Amino acid sequence: MKINILTLFPEMFDIFKHSIIGRARENGFLHIETVNIRDYTLNKHKKVDDYPYGGGAGMVMTPQPIVDAIKAVKEKNKGKVIFLGPRGKTFNQEMAKELSKEEELIFVCGHYEGIDQRIYKYFDLEISLGDFVLTGGEMACIPVIDSISRLVPGVLGSEESFQDESYYDGTLEYPQYTRPFEFEGEKVPEVLISGHHENIRKWRRKESLLITKERRPDMFEKIKLSKEDIKLLKSK
């Protein structure tokens, strides 16, 4: 997958040079490039923002630099243009799955008080992280790209790595334990050291369902429970 990020702060995405995403880039599974919107401004002072018509606090990003940057990237990349902003659809795992199937994606990060309304017609999709305010689109773009990237084949090395994670199948993940067996008087559940893989699978599924029911009843209501799920929930 190829990802282009249009931003005023390319250095903020250096985080993708490290860890799993960094290795995926080195191995050719991901190609991430940043484009500095400021490089496309025609203003001799390199300004990319101006005062809003009608008055108001803050500055608004002007249309020319962003639109020209989008057009330049689109000449070589045919991916969807995605804007990170409060009006967008709330991002979730299902959206991450769908976007991970794309070969190319183009992200546009806004800043200041927002962007000129005339830019919006260039976006194929608008995404929001939720009902809260961030300093800029970069802050939202990083977790969105990370979530999408880890679903791209080859990035995690094994599909099983993300299939057991929270949200993948509509449930929260089951509890995890590691050494030592006993810590501050609390022991690891016996089933996890039994070596009985089927019992371990059932325990994990039951715990996942119970945690989801308790912590996220809104998610639990959407789960299509199997006969086994119902039996597990009724068991002691």
From Swiss-Prot:
Compartments (UniProt record): Cytoplasm
The UniProt keyword set, sorted, is: Cytoplasm, Methyltransferase, S-adenosyl-L-methionine, Transferase, tRNA processing
Offer an example of a GO molecular function term for this protein. tRNA (guanine(37)-N1)-methyltransferase activity
Q: What InterPro entries does its record include?
A: Alpha/beta_knot_MTases (IPR029028), tRNA_m1G_MeTrfase_C_sf (IPR023148), tRNA_m1G_MeTrfase_TrmD (IPR002649), tRNA_m1G_MTases_N (IPR029026), tRNA_MeTrfase_TRMD/TRM10 (IPR016009)
For this entry, list what GO says about its biological process. tRNA N1-guanine methylation
* One GO cellular component term noted in the UniProt record for this chain: cytosol
The lineage's top-level taxon is Bacteria
Q: Which cysteines are joined by disulfide bonds?
A: none
E.C. number(s) listed in UniProt: 2.1.1.228
Any one Pfam family here would be tRNA_m1G_MT
* Catalyzed chemical reaction(s): guanosine(37) in tRNA + S-adenosyl-L-methionine = N(1)-methylguanosine(37) in tRNA + S-adenosyl-L-homocysteine + H(+)
The residues that the entry says bind S-adenosyl-L-methionine are: G110, L129, G130, D131, F132, V133, L134
Q: Which protein family is named in the record?
A: Belongs to the RNA methyltransferase TrmD family.
Q: Which PANTHER family does the record match to this protein?
A: TRNA (GUANINE-N(1)-)-METHYLTRANSFERASE
Q: How does it assemble?
A: Homodimer.
Task: Write out the function statement from the record.
Answer: Specifically methylates guanosine-37 in various tRNAs.
Q: What is this protein called?
A: tRNA (guanine-N(1)-)-methyltransferase
Organism encoding this protein: Clostridium perfringens (strain SM101 / Type A)
